[in-house]
């Protein structure tokens, strides 16, 4: 079983939320929500390994290390290619003696309807958003099992729970629903040695959304605004930390109330 975090009841809540001395790996960590996750983890004391594909991560890694006094590393990896994911974990294990936290944050969205998109576009979204999470988890699981501990926090989406409007994005919605069910399945399979959770962001200003606020989304959200990347990243901190030592199989929705209406 996964026991409570060490001295859980006697520790201050701020200490439980601290990641000091822990090693975190964030796939898709060079930009957007992934970059915010790396920054928040580093602020909490974790060393960070940024795994990127299209956006080089060296600049982000250097800035995060300098700002927080932690160690950061990078490597390039296409999560849809199993051999590349295996290679990434081999590189990670060269610098981290333990891997405490893994975040599969890879994701794309073409924003096309089922009629307009091609077979190849649909398959590509499933490959990146769902199969990519599996490929990362497939490599993280044996490491967690050998260590006897680990926390995997994947990026799902409110789109995996509801069909959000006004845009049409059937492939994205389908892939993120799959991520949520995959995480629940892994939480049960890995119950003896790891915690597995996911965060489902709502409409967020990030690189995926062009780095701008989308006014057309605001009327659909009770808060009448888009979320900030750091507001989303804070949820990952909780699930990755010792404070969440009884949380597994959780889909933490952070959407400004969108899925409540």
UniProtKB/Swiss-Prot annotation:
It comes from Schizosaccharomyces pombe (strain 972 / ATCC 24843). Belongs to the short-chain dehydrogenases/reductases (SDR) family. GO terms for molecular function: oxidoreductase activity, acting on the CH-OH group of donors, NAD or NADP as acceptor. Pfam families: adh_short_C2. One of its GO terms (cellular component) is cytosol. This is Uncharacterized oxidoreductase C22A12.17c. It is an enzyme of class 1 (oxidoreductase). Coiled coil: none annotated. Keywords: Cytoplasm, NADP, Nucleus, Oxidoreductase. It is found in: Cytoplasm; Nucleus. The active site is at 157 (proton donor), 172 (proton acceptor), 176 (lowers pka of active site tyr). Its main location: cytoplasm. CDD domains: MDH-like_SDR_c (cd05352). NADP(+) binds at residues 33, 78, 105, 172, 176, 206. InterPro entries: NAD(P)-bd_dom_sf, Sc_DH/Rdtase_CS, SDR_fam. Disulfide bonds: none annotated. Its EC number is 1.-.-.-.
């Amino acid at each position: 079983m996964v026991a409570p975090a060490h001295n859980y009841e006697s520790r201050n809540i701020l200490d439980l939320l601290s990641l000091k001395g822990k090693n975190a790996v964030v796939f898709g960590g060079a930009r957007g929500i992934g970059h915010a996750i790396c920054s928040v983890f580093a602020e909490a004391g974790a060393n960070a390994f940024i795994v990127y594909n299209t956006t080089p991560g060296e600049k982000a890694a250097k800035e995060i290390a300098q700002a927080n006094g932690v160690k950061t590393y990078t490597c390039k990896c296409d999560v849809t290619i199993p051999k590349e994911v295996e290679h990434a974990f081999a590189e990670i294990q060269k610098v981290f003696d333990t891997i405490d936290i893994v975040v599969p944050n890879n994701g794309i969205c073409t924003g096309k309807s089922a009629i307009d998109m091609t077979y190849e576009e649909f398959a590509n979204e499933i490959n990146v958003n769902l199969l990519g999470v599996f490929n990362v988890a497939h490599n993280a699981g044996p490491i967690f099992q050998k260590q006897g501990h680990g926390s995997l926090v994947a990026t799902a989406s409110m789109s995996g729970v509801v069909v959000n409007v006004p845009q049409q994005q059937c492939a994205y919605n389908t892939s993120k629903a799959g991520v949520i069910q995959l995480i629940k399945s892994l939480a049960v399979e890995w119950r003896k040695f790891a915690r597995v959770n996911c965060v489902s962001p709502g409409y967020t200003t990030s690189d995926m959304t062009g780095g701008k606020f989308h006014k057309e989304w605001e009327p659909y959200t009770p808060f009448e605004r888009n979320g900030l990347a750091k507001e989303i990243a804070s949820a990952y901190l909780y699930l990755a930390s010792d404070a969440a030592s009884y949380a597994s199989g959780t889909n933490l929705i952070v959407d400004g109330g969108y899925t409540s209406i």
